[in-house]
C-alpha cells in the first residue's frame, strides 16, 4: 500500500539509481510516460491563455518531472500578460531539472523563480516520479493527484491567504508581502505500482471536476492492457480530462467543486452582503480584480453555481513497465522535449527582452548607488550613456506614472516619490537601441 505524506517543511526526496516498482507482486524496472494538454479561457484564445506546463523525462526513462504554472489573470488590468511569466517559469524549471538532477523540487522552483525576471505572477505545482516514489511542491491552487485502480491515493490541498487569494510567486509584485518558494507545501508518496497515474494540473481542472471523476476517467482508459502503448494512454487521459473540465466550465448548473466552495464561503459572509476575500498576501493590491488566477466572480460561474471558466492545463504521468513499453516511452519523451522547445521558441522575444532588462537593471543599480551613496558605479559605461528621461521629465511625473515607467523596465516600484525619481533618473538608454515600454512611452508623451 502506498504511503502519502503532505507537509509544509520540505526535505530532499530520494531518487537516483535504478527505478523499480511492483507489478502483480513482481519487481519490474520502471519508466515514466508523460503528456501535457491545455486549453485557454475562451476569452483568451488570441493570447494563448495564462497557463503553462512542461514534462521532462530522463534519458534512461526512469524519472520524470511534471509541472504546471497558472498565470494570475488580475495582472492584465495592469497591462501585464502573466502567461509570459508562467511560460518562462516552466521553461526555466525544465532546463533546471534537465541539468541539475540532484536538486529538490523546492530548489528547482527557487531557481526558476530567480530566472523569471519579468512582470507577472503564477501559482505552480511540480512533481517528480522515480520508481515507486513521487514527491512534489505546491504554491497556491495548482495541485497534484495520484490515482490507482479508481482510488485517489494522494490529493494536495490548495494554499490560500483568504478566499480566492491563493499563494503565488511573482517578480516585482505590485504590493504586499510576496510569497516565495520557501512558502510552498511539499508532498511525497512511496509504494507506487506500475499503471499508477500522477496528475499535475491548474485549478481549471480541480475547480470543475471532482477527484472521484478524475479517477473514473483514468480507470476507463484501461492502462493494464497488453499493447504497451503508454504514450497513447497518457495522451488519451489528458484529452479526456481536458474535455470533461471544458464541458463543466461551460455548464452553469452542474455540481462542481468550485460551486460547493462558493456555497460554503457565502455561508460565512454577512447575510445579504457581498463576497469578501481576505486582505493578506501578494494580491492585497489586486483585491478589486478578484485576487485569483482569473476573474473568479459570479459572472464566471453562473451566479455561484455550475462550473468556472478558466484556463485548463493537465499533465499526466504514468508509471510503466520499461521492458514492455520502452519504444512507446521513448516516443512519449520525444513529445515532452518537443513541447519544451516549442515553448522556448515562442518565448524567445520575451526572454531576450528579459535579458536586456537584467543588464539594464545592473547598470541602473550601479548608477543609483553612486547617486545616493556617492560610491563608484558598478559599470563604468553606465554613466557615459544618455539618460532615458531628462531630470525635468522625471520631476514632472506623479507617483503613478513613475511606478508605471519603472515597472515597464522591470525595476522596483516601492518607496517614496523622491526615491522613485532618483531610480528612474538613473536609467540610461539601451546602448543597442532596443525598444522598451519606457522608451516607447517617452516617445508617445513627447508627441
What is the predicted role of each segment?
Residues 379-443:
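Basic helix-extension-helix modules of the SAP/HeH family
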Amino acid at each position: 500500500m502506498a504511503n502519502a505524506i503532505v507537509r509544509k517543511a520540505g526535505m530532499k526526496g530520494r531518487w537516483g539509481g535504478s527505478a523499480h516498482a511492483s507489478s502483480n507482486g513482481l519487481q519490474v524496472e520502471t519508466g515514466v510516460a508523460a503528456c501535457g494538454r491545455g486549453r485557454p479561457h475562451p476569452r483568451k484564445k488570441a493570447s494563448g491563455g495564462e497557463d503553462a506546463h512542461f514534462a521532462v523525462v530522463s534519458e534512461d526513462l526512469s524519472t520524470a518531472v511534471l509541472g504546471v504554472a497558472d498565470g494570475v489573470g488580475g495582472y492584465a488590468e495592469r497591462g501585464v500578460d502573466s502567461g509570459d511569466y508562467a511560460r518562462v517559469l516552466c521553461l526555466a524549471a525544465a532546463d533546471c531539472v534537465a541539468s541539475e538532477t540532484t536538486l529538490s523540487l523546492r530548489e528547482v522552483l527557487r531557481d526558476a523563480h530567480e530566472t523569471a525576471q519579468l512582470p507577472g505572477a503564477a501559482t505552480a505545482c511540480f512533481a517528480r516520479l522515480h520508481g515507486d516514489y513521487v514527491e512534489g511542491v505546491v504554491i497556491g491552487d495548482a495541485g497534484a493527484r495520484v490515482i490507482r485502480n479508481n482510488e485517489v491515493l494522494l490529493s494536495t490541498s490548495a494554499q490560500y491567504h483568504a478566499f480566492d487569494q491563493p499563494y503565488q510567486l511573482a517578480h516585482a509584485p505590485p504590493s504586499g508581502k510576496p510569497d516565495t518558494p520557501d512558502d510552498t507545501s511539499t508532498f511525497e508518496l512511496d509504494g507506487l505500482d506500475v499503471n499508477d497515474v500522477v496528475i499535475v494540473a491548474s485549478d481549471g481542472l480541480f475547480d470543475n471536476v471532482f477527484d472521484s471523476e478524475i479517477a473514473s476517467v483514468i480507470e476507463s482508459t484501461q492502462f493494464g492492457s497488453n499493447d504497451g502503448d503508454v504514450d497513447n494512454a497518457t495522451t488519451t487521459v489528458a484529452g479526456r480530462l481536458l474535455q470533461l473540465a471544458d464541458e463543466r466550465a461551460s455548464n452553469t448548473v452542474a455540481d462542481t467543486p468550485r460551486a460547493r466552495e462558493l456555497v460554503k464561503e457565502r455561508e460565512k459572509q454577512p447575510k445579504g452582503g457581498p463576497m469578501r476575500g481576505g486582505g493578506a498576501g501578494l494580491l492585497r493590491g489586486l483585491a478589486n480584480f478578484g485576487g485569483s488566477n482569473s476573474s473568479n466572480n459570479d459572472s464566471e460561474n453562473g451566479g455561484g453555481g455550475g462550473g468556472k471558466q478558466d484556463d485548463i492545463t493537465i499533465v499526466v504521468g504514468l508509471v510503466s513497465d520499461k521492458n514492455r513499453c520502452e519504444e512507446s516511452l521513448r516516443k512519449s519523451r520525444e513529445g515532452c522535449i518537443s513541447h519544451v522547445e516549442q515553448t522556448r521558441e515562442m518565448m524567445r522575444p520575451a526572454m531576450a527582452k528579459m535579458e536586456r532588462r537584467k543588464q539594464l537593471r545592473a547598470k541602473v543599480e550601479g548608477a543609483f548607488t553612486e547617486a545616493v551613496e556617492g560610491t563608484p558605479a558598478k559599470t563604468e559605461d553606465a554613466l557615459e550613456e544618455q539618460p532615458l528621461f531628462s531630470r525635468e521629465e522625471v520631476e514632472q511625473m506623479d507617483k503613478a506614472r513613475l511606478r508605471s515607467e519603472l515597472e515597464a523596465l522591470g525595476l522596483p516600484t516601492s518607496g517614496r516619490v523622491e526615491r522613485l525619481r532618483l531610480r528612474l533618473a538613473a536609467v540610461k538608454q539601451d546602448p543597442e537601441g532596443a525598444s522598451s515600454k519606457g522608451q516607447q512611452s517617452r516617445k508617445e508623451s513627447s508627441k
